[in-house]
Amino acid sequence: MAARLRTKYKKEIVPELNKKFKFESIMQVPRLEKIVLNVGMGEAHTNPKALEAAVEELALITGQRPVKTKAKKSIAGFKIREGMSLGCMVTLRGDYMYEFLDRLVNVALPRVRDFKGVNDKGFDGRGNYNMSIKEQIIFPEIKVDKINTLYGINMTFVTNSKSNEEALSLLAAFGMPYRNQK
């Protein structure tokens, strides 16, 4: 069975955006292509168990096994060597992407303390949106008593839209709660 947001996109969001922006073809309507989640851990080179825990927790959150990211260069000031594992990342596409977005918008973000909406200034000018969360414990899959370290997660929402306005409308139609929404 297809993800709930995928069917919502096909049945509701595409006609709505097509009407709003007056595209010539239905293929010009912006769509979400992938979501990339990245965790960078500074203490990963001194505490490898923290990185393993982050990999396991990111796998729980996304339903997909993350890949460890390695240092490209040695930096003596930070005591890291080339090839050391410093974080992990996962790229979500298809049903995994829509399921994660559904859980993020409807379950995780409302659990953030004093949440007023996400910032709408995270667009890069090409229709991609970047945001981060400060703690991984907002996801219900993470058991608070089992975690050792808190870390943030950077998220990039990659769309095929040409402008920030189109991407903002797309993500808002998916239910992303923006702070300064009109």
From Swiss-Prot:
One of its GO terms (molecular function) is structural constituent of ribosome. GO terms for cellular component: ribonucleoprotein complex; ribosome. It comes from the Bacteria. PROSITE patterns: RIBOSOMAL_L5 (PS00358). InterPro entries: Ribosomal_uL5, Ribosomal_uL5_bac-type, Ribosomal_uL5_C, Ribosomal_uL5_CS, Ribosomal_uL5_dom_sf, Ribosomal_uL5_N. It holds the Pfam family Ribosomal_L5. GO terms for biological process: translation. Keywords: Ribonucleoprotein, Ribosomal protein, RNA-binding, rRNA-binding, tRNA-binding. The keyword Ribosomal protein applies. The keyword RNA-binding applies. Belongs to the universal ribosomal protein uL5 family. Part of the 50S ribosomal subunit; part of the 5S rRNA/L5/L18/L25 subcomplex. Contacts the 5S rRNA and the P site tRNA. Forms a bridge to the 30S subunit in the 70S ribosome. This is Large ribosomal subunit protein uL5.
